[in-house]
Amino acid sequence: MKTTTALVTGATAGFGLAICKKLIEAGYKVIGTGRRADRLAEIHSQLGNNFLPLAFDIRDEQATINALNTLPEGWQAVDLLVNNAGLALGLEPAHKADLQDWYQMIDTNIKGLVTITRLVLPNMVARNYGQIINLSSIAGTYPYAGSNVYGGTKAFVTQFSLNLRADLAGTKIRVSNVEPGLCGGTEFSNVRFHGDDERAAKVYENVQSVQPEDIANIVLWLHQQPEHVNINRIEVMPTAQSFAGMSVSKEK
């Protein structure tokens, strides 16, 4: 029986690392990507030779092409692409936001995701086999103050996932979109608040949030469904989180 080859972007921490561990435990070979070559080397030493580190900046199209071209024999046909790499930067209102933060979110969450998808997909189509699992967010569905461009990028990911399904109709390639809510145990809020650990910690204070291992379990479950079953979307929140109420601003 052929071993499944997965490619997981943003593999150095959080969801990505948990997904890599879970897939390897299940017998997969995993290509883990990220910008931090030293961190990927550490993960390789922990997970063994079923983990192949691939260091590059997903925002850079040519770097992505070059990295994929270095894949050794036996690793070139990707059966499962997990588009996990992404970030949020800042929580300021739109008129105060840093444009560079906006550009970085667009380049990573949208440009990086579509680039690697476009590069991996033709081989899946040629084999009529594969699955793409995109990590989006409930921020792509439910607006909140300060989400502005971050929420916009995740709305793009969700709609792109659905449109991929339309493009791939008639093939055996599956596409799923995972939309997490409040998740702890990652670098998400530390990155969003530019390294302000105290502010980041307050986001998860006194809340039992979803953990990276929960998302990893969902990813594995999605891929292990029968080939004729495609789960289009999964929206997942901690039990403590619910839908935000509509904001009303009253005149003083």
From Swiss-Prot:
<dbReference type="GO" id="GO:0005829">
    <property type="term" value="C:cytosol"/>
</dbReference>
<feature type="binding site">
    <location>
        <position position="137"/>
    </location>
    <ligand>
        <name>substrate</name>
    </ligand>
</feature>
<dbReference type="InterPro" id="IPR020904">
    <property type="entry name" value="Sc_DH/Rdtase_CS"/>
</dbReference>
<comment type="similarity">
    <text>Belongs to the short-chain dehydrogenases/reductases (SDR) family.</text>
</comment>
<protein>
    <recommendedName>
        <fullName>Probable NADP-dependent dehydrogenase HI_1430</fullName>
        <ecNumber>1.1.1.-</ecNumber>
    </recommendedName>
</protein>
<dbReference type="Pfam" id="PF00106">
    <property type="entry name" value="adh_short"/>
</dbReference>
<feature type="active site" description="Proton acceptor">
    <location>
        <position position="150"/>
    </location>
</feature>
<feature type="binding site">
    <location>
        <begin position="7"/>
        <end position="31"/>
    </location>
    <ligand>
        <name>NADP(+)</name>
    </ligand>
</feature>
<dbReference type="InterPro" id="IPR036291">
    <property type="entry name" value="NAD(P)-bd_dom_sf"/>
</dbReference>
<keyword id="KW-0521">NADP</keyword>
<dbReference type="InterPro" id="IPR002347">
    <property type="entry name" value="SDR_fam"/>
</dbReference>
<keyword id="KW-0560">Oxidoreductase</keyword>
<dbReference type="GO" id="GO:0016491">
    <property type="term" value="F:oxidoreductase activity"/>
</dbReference>
